[in-house]
Amino acid sequence: TAPILISLHSFTPVLNGVSRTWEMGVLWDADRITAEVFMHELSKAGYLVGDNEPYSGKAPQDFTIDHHAEARDIPHVGIEVRQDLIHHADGVQKVAAVMHRFMKSLPARIEPTKLRGKQGGKTA
């Protein structure tokens, strides 16, 4: 089974006085395929999902993805979870259960050979 790199972080519900309505964010640059799987599955689970929100996966500072995934043609995605959803044990359990359910199917749904040059991403 080919590896898939998932960079998982959390974000604040409010930044500089502005509410951030997304419950989950899917960050991507070169790998739109993996991002679309995550956006679809998280939306299907009832979450309001941001496409490259609350941050952009196209930012040059995404060291983990740039250096460990894109450089090796490994399928990848950045996931941001709004902190108020995981502030308590029940919320952590719910998010973990949702992610676990569909992550088990990822290797069969994402082919590593589809990464570069076939979706408008970076080319070697």
Which sequence ranges carry the predicted segments?
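His/Asp/Glu-rich mid-to-C-terminal helical/loop segments that flank catalytic regions of hydrolases
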Residues: 87-120
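Terminal accessory/targeting
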Residues: 123-124
